[in-house]
Amino acid sequence: MAKIKVEEQYFDYAPPVRVHGSLRLLLRYVPEEHLNGLHTITLTNSESLRSVRGKITSEKQRFRPADCQGLYGKGRIFLNIDLIFSQDPELFLLFPPFKTFLIGEVLYHEIGHHIHRLEEPGYRSDKEVVADEWKDKLLELFLKQRYWYLARPVRLLSPLLRLIVARLRARIGEDDT
């Protein structure tokens, strides 16, 4: 496996759950050739990125780095852990497949940018669509290989799970206002 350094760089923040193990697990399921040239993944929080000047343009919109769940640039990935976990109740994070899925969505999207830059440069102008396509491929590969036994129960319970998640998210939204 490619030697990728994982750094934790938080400012006045401690993640509600351990993230490092889930990150390493997700990386094990990415084909080796897609990780070549990727040397550092930094786990951080939005407060730590507030000092980064400038904005990032994505899909004709401009964002501050502190407002992004993940960032990719020339072999480095930054995962903004507090934003990744902010939309879901902490209770859900205690369920390892759910926590790993949340991290995987952002990590695999950023790896999609890396793959696009190295293997398909100039392939398409819409980099976000390409990164999302790679995210879907890598996440499907991971879920089929790692959590194959959850496929049938999740399929049967998905309408109920969607309802529960929607209500919890609505309740969180009400608490914020």
State the predicted function of each range:
Residues 80-82:
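Generic beta-structure capping elements
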Residues 117-130, 146-150:
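Short conserved catalytic/interaction loops centered on acidic-Pro-aromatic/His motifs
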Residues 19, 104, 127:
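Hydrophobic (often cysteine-bearing) scaffold residues that line and stabilize catalytic clefts
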Residues 84-106, 121-122:
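Short pre-active-site segment immediately N-terminal to the catalytic Zn-binding motif
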Residues 126-141:
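An active-site-proximal "capping" alpha-helix that borders the catalytic cofactor pocket
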Residues 105-118, 131:
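Active-site recognition of the HExxH zinc-binding catalytic motif
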Residues 2-7, 17-20, 142-177:
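Long, well-structured alpha-helical subdomains associated
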